[in-house]
Amino acid sequence: MNIEEKIIKNFSFNNKFIGDDCAYLKDTKQLISTDSITENTHFDLKKFTAMQIAHRLFVSNFSDIQSSGGEPKYALFNISFPKKKSILALSISKNLRNMIKKNKITIIGGDTTSSKDIFLSLTLISKKIDRSKVILRSKSKVNDEIYLFKNIGFSKLGFLNLY
């Protein structure tokens, strides 16, 4: 078991949603998903524009909610960056804000801090959805059908191309 798996296991507490793209909050009947990306791990500033960085963060969260049957409604955005990269951080934030607004998602909060490298985190919360309509990987069974509408594997290919 690698360190990432150990950290995840540390917080599992028999939670049936760990490992799925989203968690279903039965009290509010909403899906929630969060992802983070960091400079020099998920993107290289020499190879990615502010728009591409924002797009990567947005799409990873947006697709998690949609693939689980939900429609994003609210967003929380966190960004950490060094002062010398503040113009780039602002550009990434503006691009992300435009994607969020275009999809009629309301930004309800977040945080900004300083750090050595750029760190971005986005959390999306869906509109209300009935539990019976939620699609979770943990509920998949042998012989379930999977439909792909676009090419897959480009995220990994892009990552391998960076280093």
Describe the residue ranges of each PLM region.
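Helix-biased detector of long, well-ordered alpha-helical tracts
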Residues: 1-163
